[in-house]
Amino acid sequence: LSGKMQVFTGERGDYHRTRLTHTQEVASLARTLSRALRLNEDLVEALALLHDIGHPPFGHAGEDALDECLQPDGQFSHNQYALTIVEDLEERYPGFPGLNLSYEVLESQITRVDKTARSHYPLLEAQVVDAADSTTYDAHDTDDAIKLELLTLDELSEMSLIREALAAVNSEFTNLDATQLRASVVHYLLNRQVSDILATSAEDLLRYDFQSSDEARHGELVVRPSKELQEQKEELEGFLYERVYRHPELLKMRQRAQDRLQAMFLKYQTHPEWFPKKYLSLIHISEPTRRKR
């Protein structure tokens, strides 16, 4: 994950987050949430470390490029590919492929593959990871956008959550330079979300009083922000989508990245012998199956 970008490609510089740094941040935050809610910290950490492992290079731009390459015979989903990695591609044991992960880890990842088809909510530990993921990227995409000069704090102050953060920081500190102010705002964004999620989730857990993990699966979504914070997050995410993720410069980088990845796909499709030897045996299967994979 260390060489894989999240939103920004490396063309803007090295001082922004990658999939690895994002994953580490999600895992740390998820453990904090799970500890406060008295959930299974080890399971939460495993799910957090797994949640983005299936992403190709260039983030969602790469995922879209591979998905287009596989049409009309199949599709590419980073959540599905994560399962392929841990069940088929990894070779850690002599008797079988994969990592021999627990049922709870695999079940939780499966619920990420097609969220629209869920017949029940995922385990509370998986809900914690989803909440930590959302909390982390809202704060850190904001941070990266400012550092890369795609947005200013003045522009971001149009958003309710950023205005709240600036007001809180300015009431506590004076004479901060730009770097200190940005870092303090990001720190507030993280603390504000974590505190809200813990308060809302703890209240829901007391109300539902689940007696088993099965009851939690078939209950309501429990680990979540309050309605007020969710509205603020959606406002900020919409702003980031329009002003950052759809920024003309990023769209150009996205297209260049997709062109490179699709060219590589076509070359490997024409020359499968270029694959590392350990993967060649997976290619020598029936043509329809290979095309779908």
Q: What residue spans do the PLM features occupy?
A:
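Alpha-helix N-cap/helix-initiation motif
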Residues: Y15-R19, H55, Q75, Y121, ...
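C-terminal subdomains that position terminal phosphate/3'-OH groups for nucleotidyl transfer/ligation
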Residues: L176-S281
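Alpha-helical phosphate/pyrophosphate-handling elements in metalloenzyme active cores
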Residues: R12-L43
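Sequence-structural signature of the catalytic-core scaffold of metal-dependent phosphohydrolases
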Residues: L1-G3, Q24, S28-R31, R35-A36, ...
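Acidic (Asp/Glu-rich) catalytic motifs at the cytosolic membrane interface
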Residues: L50
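Single conserved hydrophobic/aromatic residue that forms the stacking wall/gate
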Residues: I283-R293
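Active-site alpha-helix of zinc metalloproteases
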Residues: A46-L47
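Active-site flanking loop/helix segments enriched in acidic
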Residues: L1-T21, T116
